[in-house]
Amino acid sequence: MRRGLLRLAPLVLAASCGPTEPSPSPAPTATPDPCATAPSAYAKAVLDSWIPACSLAQDIYNDPTKALGAPDAGGSGPNNFTGFVSLGFGGRVTLDLGGCIADVAGPDLRIFQAVGSEPVSVYVSLSPAGPFTLVEARKECGGAYSGIRRYCDVDIASGGATQARYVRVEDGELFPCPGGTVSEGADLDAVQALAVATVGLRDPGR
């Protein structure tokens, strides 16, 4: 009899404690909305950049932050230019507009280049991690603007994109380095979101 009572004890204890509740599952982490904020008229932050070592060894215009804000390239060459970053052989800079632009009829982005008319390739993405969509491949970027500044316009729909926040500009000249200059590759001055108003924003020299 005593042995039977001992066998019943665990069952009585379990019943008194009630059913075991499963541990609650952790709430999923919300994915940030890249389009929650309004875009700036000009790129406002550098996401990443890469310039090949053989170009860095002789280029003197290597600061990717020079591609931020309104176009402001100026000065005289070869050693006294200001306001741009030389991308070097196949180099690139990826910029953040601060919010999403949506495709509209006609061009959506204006790429400002300095001094020459070297071609550029342009990619866009909604995520800093990509994937990046090619929207222009090696487009000549030499439209006259002012002073030493040149430009070319890009329609993101050319690559099938409908929205974009991050813009990657890549050298399309592809002249092997070292090339014997201090400003190898395309010289990136600024990236503009054409549908965003620029009222009150200063564009030096325009």
Label the predicted regions.
Residues 30-200:
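A domain-level signal for the mature, folded cores of soluble proteins
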Residues 202-206:
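Short, solvent-exposed mixed-charge patches
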Residues 14-16:
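C-terminal motif of bacterial Sec signal peptides marking the signal peptidase cleavage site
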Residues 18-20:
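Bacterial signal peptide processing site
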Residues 1-9:
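Bacterial N-terminal signal peptides that target proteins for export
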Residues 23-31:
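Ser/Thr-rich, Proline-interspersed low-complexity disordered segments
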